[in-house]
């Protein structure tokens, strides 16, 4: 075995371990290539087979909920998920995860530019306090931007007076999916599918505290920082945003 193969085996093993054993050959190839070592999907498949590594993803499971309060807010986004800059359009949703002896609810906010998770919150109740905390985290972490559009489904935790007041305070424009149509918020659905197939154990977590720790680790350490995203051309959300701001600075200096 030559030195190059030994190095590739090591990088593949590290990437597989970092993904909690969920990454397949394509994801492994993108991760290693993003680290500066070129690796094709075909070769990754062969080396993973040699190392006895397989992707241990579970079937997807999706959570939908009904609205308890109807308000007249149009679908401003209309499935236009490709945006041109960060902080133009954010999207949010809620899912549930088993934690020992009851369900825990996870609310997330994603910036659609690079599919980066910018806000999240976990609670034992799927209410507007949960979704409000996720939105507040996003708003603070992004430097309190103006002119953002926020898109979600028609769940009561997004249509409540309390949540709409928070949007008004942050000067964020609200957009709601059509009732019962999950494709109107497809990027969030894909994130939840990735989380549950790549990271969350089949039987859930042993406790609320363990779930908080592991899901935060997935979002910060793996999904945003290490996991390549097809929408970003194989780049991670963090790298895609970094390149945008770097290019924006270059254009500004040139101008």
Predicted regions and their residues:
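Basic, flexible linker segments flanking DNA-binding modules
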Residues: 1-85, 181, 236-248
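Mobile genetic element proteins and their domesticated derivatives, centered on retroelements
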Residues: 12, 28, 44, 48, ...
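Short amphipathic alpha-helical interaction patches enriched in hydrophobic/aromatic residues
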Residues: 16, 32, 36, 121, ...
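RNase H-like polynucleotidyl transferase catalytic core
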Residues: 57-62, 122, 150-154, 168-187, ...
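An active-site-proximal beta-strand-loop segment
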Residues: 79, 83-118, 124-126
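Active-site beta-loop-alpha junctions of metal-dependent nucleic acid enzymes
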Residues: 102, 121-143, 149, 159
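C-terminal domain-tail junction helix/linker
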Residues: 168-172, 194-255
